[in-house]
């Protein structure tokens, strides 16, 4: 992870799995310490959208995102459905420079 966020050619990192509550689920704790800024709205929006798909089970997701060295990092649940939801309904548009009114692209190339 440290190599990726140090690489000027990598602007986005997607991590899947480890966002639940079992003893093996430590992705948010391991990755969030690297964040310069957390994208609080990502987890909130992901759970809101997921609620429409899986109901209250979404409360078990600890999906997080943040910026580390001008790289945006998304920590997603391990299920393919959750990854698809995050990509199609949140991440893809935020990585599109033409998406309005705002997107993440300018934050990825400022350094």
Language-model features, listed with the residues they occupy:
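Non-catalytic beta/alpha edge segments that cap or flank active sites
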Residues: 1-111
């Amino acid at each position: 992870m440290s190599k990726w966020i140090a690489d000027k050619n990598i602007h986005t990192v997607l991590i899947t799995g480890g966002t639940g509550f079992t003893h093996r689920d430590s992705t948010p704790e391991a990755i969030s310490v690297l964040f310069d800024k957390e994208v609080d709205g990502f987890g909130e929006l992901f759970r809101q959208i997921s609620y429409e798909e899986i109901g209250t089970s979404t409360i078990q997701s600890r999906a997080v995102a943040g910026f580390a060295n001008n790289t945006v990092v998304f920590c997603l649940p391990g299920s393919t459905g959750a990854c698809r939801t995050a990509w199609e309904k949140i991440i893809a548009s935020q990585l599109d420079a033409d998406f309005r009114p705002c997107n993440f692209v300018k934050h990825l190339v400022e350094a």
